[in-house]
């Protein structure tokens, strides 16, 4: 074969490359439109039956010289790239996505700027039991410079016979204590009907793990001008967690804090399994601040310090933990709450590694 003939073949290969490129991009645009249609219908983007049908059709029409296995490998990569295009389009469309808003969202809680680069703490009892109990914890928190107090007034429990909380009376106690100690308060709301009433008493609406996909509650929380702390569901994927936050933001409320609180696995050594890798993933995928609840993720008082260190080291915007004047007589979760001296020691060990906004 002469050099001229070789050059002609190379030119032909170059032309075919450009034709293939054009067809691949044309296919990509079609796939993106299919993705939009599937999203509108609520259908999964990946359809293994459809993919197998397409591969079978391609192989049946393969006249060589490539082996069927080679052709199948090439087209599976094309299909994979198309699926990634659909997922990229979906993530770009989300209001919570960092692709939509590159800069960090800062959540203002009575002057505390969550997400500004300074790491903070939220502490308080698992459940509001009395004014005296909450006031004692508030005094200890205030002494340590903590400005956000947590406390459960409505308690969704696994058993219907466990303590369910004081309800509105608990919110009133939180409000009274917060006013006396100049603190912000956060408390869980479990039904949309309670949100309007709760606004008079709390500074942050908490949506707990069991309600992460209570979509009516998410929409109701998104419709009010009050910060929301959203906890990850017991067995929720990160994608499901992000989409739950999207429900809130889609209603107009962008003051959202995400909270990793452990997920359910087969491990029984801890109450849940802390997914520490979720923190940087959520920080990369969204523009929202991320907290870690070390109490519910472990269920063990002896693990609160190392898990809090891990949370701060990996870049969480803050740590949430439970404190009780006398955990041994607590009406809920006594094994995982810190007594006040334990809390003070815990915080003193963490303070040297806390990142402060310059």
From Swiss-Prot:
Gene3D superfamilies: Aldolase class I, Chorismate mutase
Recorded catalytic activity of this chain's protein: D-erythrose 4-phosphate + phosphoenolpyruvate + H2O = 7-phospho-2-dehydro-3-deoxy-D-arabino-heptonate + phosphate; chorismate = prephenate
GO biological process: amino acid biosynthetic process; aromatic amino acid family biosynthetic process; chorismate biosynthetic process
Gene Ontology MF, one: chorismate mutase activity
PTM annotation (Phosphoserine): residues: 2
Xref: InterPro entries: Aldolase_TIM, Chorismate_mutase_GmP-bac, Class-I_DAHP_synthase, CM_dom_sf, CM_II_prokaryot, DAHP1/KDSA, DAHP_syn_2
Keywords: Amino-acid biosynthesis, Aromatic amino acid biosynthesis, Isomerase, Multifunctional enzyme, Phosphoprotein, Transferase
Domain named Chorismate mutase: residues: 1-90
EC number: 2.5.1.54, 5.4.99.5
Superkingdom to which the source organism belongs: Bacteria
Pathway: Metabolic intermediate biosynthesis; chorismate biosynthesis; chorismate from D-erythrose 4-phosphate and phosphoenolpyruvate: step 1/7; Metabolic intermediate biosynthesis; prephenate biosynthesis; prephenate from chorismate: step 1/1
UniProt similarity note: Belongs to the class-I DAHP synthase family.
PANTHER family for the chain: PHOSPHO-2-DEHYDRO-3-DEOXYHEPTONATE ALDOLASE (PTHR43018), PROTEIN AROA(G) (PTHR43018:SF1)
Listed name of the protein: Protein AroA(G)
Biological source species: Bacillus subtilis (strain 168)
Organism placement in taxonomy: Bacteria, Bacillati, Bacillota, Bacilli, Bacillales
Gene coding for it: aroA
């Amino acid at each position: 074969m002469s050099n001229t003939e070789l050059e002609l073949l190379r030119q032909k290969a170059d032309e075919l490359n450009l034709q293939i490129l054009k067809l691949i991009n044309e296919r990509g645009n079609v796939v993106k439109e299919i993705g939009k249609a599937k999203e509108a219908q609520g259908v999964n983007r990946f359809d293994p039956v459809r993919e197998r049908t397409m591969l079978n059709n391609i192989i049946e029409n393969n006249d060589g010289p490539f082996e069927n296995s080679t052709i199948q490998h090439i087209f599976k990569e094309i299909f994979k790239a198309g699926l990634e295009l659909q997922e990229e389009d979906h993530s770009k469309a989300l209001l919570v996505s960092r692709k939509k808003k590159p800069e960090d969202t800062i959540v203002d809680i009575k002057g505390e700027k969550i997400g500004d680069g300074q790491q903070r703490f939220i502490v308080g009892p698992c459940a509001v039991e009395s004014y005296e109990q909450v006031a004692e914890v508030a005094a200890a928190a205030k002494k340590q410079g903590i400005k956000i107090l947590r406390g459960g007034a409505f308690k969704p429990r696994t058993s219907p016979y466990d303590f369910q909380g004081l309800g509105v009376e608990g919110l009133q106690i939180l409000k009274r204590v917060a006013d006396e100690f100049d603190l912000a308060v956060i408390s869980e709301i479990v039904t949309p009907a309670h949100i309007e009433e709760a606004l008079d008493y709390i500074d942050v609406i908490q949506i707990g793990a069991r309600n992460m996909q209570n979509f009516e509650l998410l929409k109701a929380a998104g419709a009010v001008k009050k910060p929301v702390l959203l906890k990850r569901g017991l067995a929720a994927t990160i994608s499901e967690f992000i989409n739950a936050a999207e429900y809130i933001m889609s209603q107009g409320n962008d003051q959202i804090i995400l909270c990793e609180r452990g997920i359910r696995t087969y491990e029984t050594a801890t109450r849940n399994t802390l997914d520490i890798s979720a923190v940087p993933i959520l920080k990369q995928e969204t523009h929202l601040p991320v907290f870690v609840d070390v109490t519910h993720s472990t269920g063990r008082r002896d693990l609160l310090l190392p898990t809090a260190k891990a949370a701060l080291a990996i870049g969480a915007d803050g740590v949430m933990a439970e404190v009780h004047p006398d955990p041994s007589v607590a009406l809920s979760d006594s094994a995982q709450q810190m007594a006040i001296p334990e809390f003070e020691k815990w915080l003193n060990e963490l303070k040297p590694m806390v990142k402060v906004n310059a």
